[in-house]
């Protein structure tokens, strides 16, 4: 069963059927609506690069409803957002958790949004290790370095002190849209259009 809707567009040249994501891409909208893994990251990065090649001046809109996922895959998206010329507006719909919240904060300053009932969750990276003691030590050191890097970037993106970020990400920390705004993860809570 195909759960991806199809949109039929009629022009003077005839009809064309698009899957909904391809149609949204024409309007510079990218949807991140799943766990972040390498395949999702490659898809998002490809779309960002494609939209930059089409028009390096127009904003790109990244809608996020994600429980998070792989840190390295998330960094691929984050670095691309920072690298490309167009501003990337980030919009939280539903939930932006873990790496999803990190990408929400990655949007262009002043252009990071959350819908009124959206939730944001920040925490420290998760990981596991097994094997010999030295292998466990290597893995532990790596995750500590990763945590420090994530905390440093979150501090820069939110305006919070590194100490506050470390304290607030020690455990799962759930924020409402308004709380995410006060924290600096988003710049504005979107109100319904009238």
UniProtKB/Swiss-Prot annotation:
Region forming the signal peptide: none
Transmembrane regions: none
Top-level enzyme category: hydrolase
SUPFAM superfamilies membership: ClpP/crotonase
InterPro entries: ClpP, ClpP/crotonase-like_dom_sf, ClpP/TepA, ClpP_His_AS, ClpP_Ser_AS
GO MF assignments: ATP-dependent peptidase activity; ATPase binding; serine-type endopeptidase activity
Catalytic activity: Hydrolysis of proteins to small peptides in the presence of ATP and magnesium. alpha-casein is the usual test substrate. In the absence of ATP, only oligopeptides shorter than five residues are hydrolyzed (such as succinyl-Leu-Tyr-|-NHMec, and Leu-Tyr-Leu-|-Tyr-Trp, in which cleavage of the -Tyr-|-Leu- and -Tyr-|-Trp bonds also occurs)
Domain of life: Bacteria
GO cellular component, one term: cytoplasm
Role this protein plays: Cleaves peptides in various proteins in a process that requires ATP hydrolysis. Has a chymotrypsin-like activity. Plays a major role in the degradation of misfolded proteins.
Protein name from the UniProt record: ATP-dependent Clp protease proteolytic subunit
Naturally occurring in which organism (per UniProt): Staphylococcus saprophyticus subsp. saprophyticus (strain ATCC 15305 / DSM 20229 / NCIMB 8711 / NCTC 7292 / S-41)
